[in-house]
Amino acid sequence: MAYPFQLGLQDATSPIMEELTNFHDHTLMIVFLISSLVLYIISLMLTTKLTHTSTMDAQEVETIWTILPAVILILIALPSLRILYMMDEINNPVLTVKTMGHQWYWSYEYTDYKDLCFDSYMVPTNELKPGELRLLEVDNRVVLPMELPIRMLISSEDVLHSWAVPSLGLKTDAIPGRLNQATVTSNRPGLFYGQCSEICGSNHSFMPIVLEMVPLKHFENWSTSMI
């Protein structure tokens, strides 16, 4: 859950988000070291007069500044590719949920259950109950079982949308005429908030997403009551 004046990432709630957080820290350290080196060299150039204006050829230096960046890029690319394939693959999902973006709300269909589908609209500010979050609450939450792999099929009925829940490491475009896939796995129960992350019109800011992750037994009771 985000909090005011937050500068870092939200707490990781899924294995994918944990990997993304680690990759962020790994890449940020490389960027920090390179930036420090560049600033150090610039400061030396500005504060000293030790220059080589007559140097026309330096093959050793050119070799170093060609090979070293290539090695650094490999160190960044390999972990990135690993996470990319982890996000793409899903084996034996226990549940499939189809998500459709509309102007300006989301609709959900639990394809493993007959007639279990609903629309999810933002709760207006004047209808909020004490403790609820402005611009983030919805009238129908997406209830899912925790600690189990769930497949989300995401598309759109009209314009481009993007289904995003930061604490779960999820952000998938909703494209008309195309089904995109995302994997949802939560390590713990709770409410996880997201929003449409693709500008889709005048009410783009009023398309919140709320996932309620619960134990499997509670999910079965909820699904039975909804059918």
Swiss-Prot record:
What is the cofactor note?
Binds a dinuclear copper A center per subunit.
Concerning InterPro entries, the annotation shows:
CcO_II (IPR045187), CcO_II-like_C (IPR002429), CcO_II_C (IPR034210), Copper_CuA (IPR001505), Cupredoxin (IPR008972), Cyt_c_oxidase_su2 (IPR014222), Cyt_c_oxidase_su2_TM_dom (IPR011759), Cyt_c_oxidase_su2_TM_sf (IPR036257)
For the ligand (Cu cation A2), the binding residues are C196, E198, C200, H204
Membrane-traversing stretches: 15-45, 60-87
Name the chemical reaction catalysed here.
4 Fe(II)-[cytochrome c] + O2 + 8 H(+)(in) = 4 Fe(III)-[cytochrome c] + 2 H2O + 4 H(+)(out)
A Pfam family in this protein?
A: COX2_TM
GO annotation, cellular component aspect: mitochondrial inner membrane; respiratory chain complex IV
Q: What class of enzyme is it?
A: translocase
What topology in the membrane does the UniProt record assign?
Multi-pass membrane protein
Required cofactor names: Cu cation
User: Which ranges does the record list as Mitochondrial intermembrane topological domains?
Assistant: 1-14, 88-227
Q: Where in the cell is it found?
A: Mitochondrion inner membrane
Q: Which residues take part in binding Cu cation A1? A: H161, C196, C200, M207
Instruction: List the PANTHER family hit by this protein, alphabetically.
Output: CYTOCHROME C OXIDASE SUBUNIT 2, CYTOCHROME C OXIDASE, SUBUNIT II
Protein known as: Cytochrome c oxidase subunit 2
Give the originating organism: Praomys taitae
